[in-house]
Structure formats: structure tokens, C-alpha cells
């Protein structure tokens, strides 16, 4: 006999956009089975916590979230990257109902079913064709693969999520098409290593509409560019074939934006990280990219205070940044990660040195960012609207990804809508953001 009311699930999603997509997939299945989402733990039938386990600080955040769920509800299912090594969770919270690792969707659903059976059997017409999304309606993350074949010395992602497993290109494109049909204006392409897409399946073809499409970075990006939405490429490893997509950007098929986590510039540090070390060639490539696509925006992340990083190495990084002129930069102070080979490296860096170098790096980047944004004053930029304010509206240019990059603050004579793409005249710039007025629709 069916239960009278729909079971309610409270959901916490921590970590990176890849984990957010995992959460969306779990929630889509739960909604298809008649479960409802609760806004608060208190009063929900269950709480699911999708954890992050990449850094110690992320593990502490995950444990705190589990603790809050246990205190306010008591019925907690844990999944995600930290769940791949459950001992710490079990020691802190032995009463959790279930612990699973990342991408183990069926195990999570089984745990939910055991604790609170579904209201009815799943019928996919109970959820929208594009599935349930945790992002605003006008943009969505599109995950094209799982896992990673690289073995960076500071990273345990392959241990947590396994080796590269690429989705068929046809499946990715069908998901993207549904998202665009549902009103998504911006597709953020993500994976652990986006530019390695298809390597594991030898670029196998799969059917898409009336043709076959290869599971290859360039081919997929080109097809996504035909769907009529902004296409933004994230987590791109700097392989030589990345050069090929710059033409798509110059032609306006995908956004002139590349998110490439270089991590450092010193060849010695990069070798210790087990990352590509030819940074002089990288500077040449960046120069060629910008010659081919002058509007190209580069985002990157860097680690300071890596074991063995000398003052000379750090100065090399600062000088490299001056030449590369990275538009958007995220910086992290090195943290040991349990199970990472870098833990065994000699010459660990003191915390106060890490902090001092981080401060200097961010100050240098602030000046670079301000200089590059100032060049946009007087230009016209397309802006996608994210938030409507009483007097000023917040949006993003093609050079800005949501949450991690800068913003464009606009005044407009007529009301604007979230998700609308407008043309803005840029009036002024500060260190990280642009300010302007709407000049066209």
C-alpha cells in the first residue's frame, strides 16, 4: 500500500561542479520516484550529504555538514569523494545509515529505499526532460566524463573517482539539447580532464541526429557550439590538441574562454608535481592563441608553497604571470592530502611562507586583472544576467564563469530578466569587475 505523503529528502552538496552534477543525477532519480526535496534537515525523512575529500579543509567541511545533519535529523546517508575512504566518517559518526564513494548512484538510492521506501515506482515523465538541476535555470554544468588518467603528485582524484571514462558523444549532445530546450543559455563543460575526452574509447563514434560524432574534444565542442547556447570549457589540460579549439572560439562557436589549471610555472616545481614542465612553450602558445582569438580569456589555478618550492621558483612564477597575463586566477596554499605522493617529498614549506607567497601572488594578479579589464572600458560586451537588483543588475561577460570569476554591474532603462543576454557599454573597471550600461537587447 502506498504511503499517504511523499517522503522528503534534505540534500547537501559539497565540493566541485563535478560533485554537483552527481547530486543532480541522484536528485533526478529521487524525484522520478516521488521523493520531495526538503529545505531544512528538521522535518525531512532523510538527509543525504554529498561530500568532498580532496583537501583536509574540505574533509573538515564535510564532517561538519554530516555532524549538523546528524544533530538536526539523525537519519543521514553519506556519499561522494570522502566516502571512498569511510574510516574517518565511521569514527566520527558511527550512526550514519550508509557511506558510499563518488558516482555510486545506485548504492545511494538503495540506501534511501531501505530507510524510506519510495512512494511509487519511477516514471520518468514526473521530472522535466532535462532532469533536476541545482544551478539557476539559465546555466547548467555538462559533465562529459568521469575520472582521470593523469597522476599529479598532489592529487588523489584518480584514487577517488578512477581512471578516465568518457560518455558517448551522442549522449552528451542529447543531454545538452534538452537543457537548451528547457531554457539553459550557458553550458559549462566539465570533467576531471576535459581535453582528454574520448582517449579511453579511442574517440569512438556514436549516433547524433543523422550522423556519427566522434568522442573527441574538438568534435564535441564543435557540435555543442551548434545548439545556440554559450559553451564554456572548464578543466582543460594543456595538451597540444587544445590549440585546435581556438579556431572555434575565433569563429564564435564556443566562448573565447579557457580554464586551464597550470598549477605552477617553475619547471622544477612542475616536475615535482608531475605536470607538463615546458612553460616557455606554453607562453608561446598563449601568444598564438591570443593572436588567433584576441578576445580570449584565460582562467587558471596555481598552488603556492608546494614542497621544494624555492624563493627563486616563486619569483619565476610571478614573472611568468606578468608575461602570460592570465585574466582570472585562483590560488591555493599547498595542503597535504592523505594518500598523495607529494606528502613524501622533502623540503615542506612553512605555513607562514605559504601565506606570504599567496599574498604576493594575489597582489600581482590583482594588478594584472585591473590592467586587462581597463582595456575593456569603452567597448561593448555581451552580458548574461544573473541577478536583478533594485538599482543595479549583476551579470557576467563571456570572460566570466559563474561563482569563480568577476561580474559586470549594469544599469538599464528597462527591466531585465535573469538569463537574458544583453549588449552592455563598459563605462569603468576595477580590479576584478566591470561596470556599464545596457546598450542593446
UniProtKB/Swiss-Prot annotation:
[4Fe-4S] cluster 1 binds at residues 16, 52, 81. It comes from the Bacteria. Residues 7-117 form the MTTase N-terminal domain. Keywords: 4Fe-4S, Cytoplasm, Iron, Iron-sulfur, Metal-binding, S-adenosyl-L-methionine, Transferase. Pfam families: Radical_SAM (PF04055), TRAM_2 (PF18693), UPF0004 (PF00919). Residues 134-371 form the Radical SAM core domain. It catalyses: L-aspartate(89)-[ribosomal protein uS12]-hydrogen + (sulfur carrier)-SH + AH2 + 2 S-adenosyl-L-methionine = 3-methylsulfanyl-L-aspartate(89)-[ribosomal protein uS12]-hydrogen + (sulfur carrier)-H + 5'-deoxyadenosine + L-methionine + A + S-adenosyl-L-homocysteine + 2 H(+). Gene3D superfamilies: Methylthiotransferase, N-terminal domain (3.40.50.12160), Nucleic acid-binding proteins (2.40.50.140), tm_1862 like domain (3.80.30.20). SUPFAM superfamilies: Radical SAM enzymes. One of its GO terms (biological process) is tRNA modification. Residues 374-440 form the TRAM domain. Binds 2 [4Fe-4S] clusters. One cluster is coordinated with 3 cysteines and an exchangeable S-adenosyl-L-methionine. Its cofactor is [4Fe-4S] cluster. GO terms for molecular function: 4 iron, 4 sulfur cluster binding; aspartic acid methylthiotransferase activity; metal ion binding; protein methylthiotransferase activity. It is found in: Cytoplasm. Belongs to the methylthiotransferase family. RimO subfamily. Catalyzes the methylthiolation of an aspartic acid residue of ribosomal protein uS12. This is Ribosomal protein uS12 methylthiotransferase RimO. The gene is rimO.
